[in-house]
């Protein structure tokens, strides 16, 4: 990654290592140097890179259907996951909405909160609170409720209150 491809809020002190491959919790760069992956995100921390069981499950699903069509159709995989989630969460959920990641999940929750208060006739309840240095995602809505001022500055005027 070069300075031209870095996000504007990230400042590199030099050339970044170029990762060639990864296994488990380790990254290996093009020169063969190994690193513990401290930046891969929650799924990598829990599962690891190149997890054979996960890769095989993904391949099996992709061979059937690559997209879940959550609002127009259902699939065995969607229904099985819903059953697992209901079981883990005590069986009390009536509705499950699948999203692609954390930013979209936060964005959906913000919209749900706004819709709820509008339906209650509480139109003035449109503000959100966040802890300092909190991070909730990359979308404008998720960024709005993040307490990471350095990441918000460039978008002031476009964010939610």
Report the location of each language-model feature.
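N-terminal glycine-rich, Lys/His-bearing helix-loop that initiates the first secondary-structure elements
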Residues: 1-95
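PLP-dependent aspartate aminotransferase-fold enzymes
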Residues: 83-161
């Amino acid at each position: 990654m070069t300075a031209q491809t870095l996000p504007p809020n990230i400042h590199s002190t030099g050339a970044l290592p170029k990762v060639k491959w990864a296994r488990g919790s380790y990254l290996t760069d093009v020169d063969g140097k190994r690193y513990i992956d401290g930046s891969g995100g929650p799924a990598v921390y829990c599962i690891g890179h190149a997890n054979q069981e996960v890769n095989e499950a993904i391949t099996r699903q992709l061979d059937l259907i690559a997209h879940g069509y959550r609002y127009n159709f259902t699939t065995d995989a969607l229904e099985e996951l819903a059953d697992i989630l209901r079981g883990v969460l005590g069986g009390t959920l009536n509705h499950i909405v699948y999203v692609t990641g954390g930013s979209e999940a936060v964005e959906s929750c913000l919209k749900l909160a706004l819709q709820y208060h509008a339906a209650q006739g509480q139109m003035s309840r449109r503000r959100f609170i966040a802890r300092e240095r909190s991070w909730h995602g990359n979308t404008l809505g998720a960024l709005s409720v993040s307490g990471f001022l350095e990441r918000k500055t460039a978008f002031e005027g476009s964010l939610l209150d």
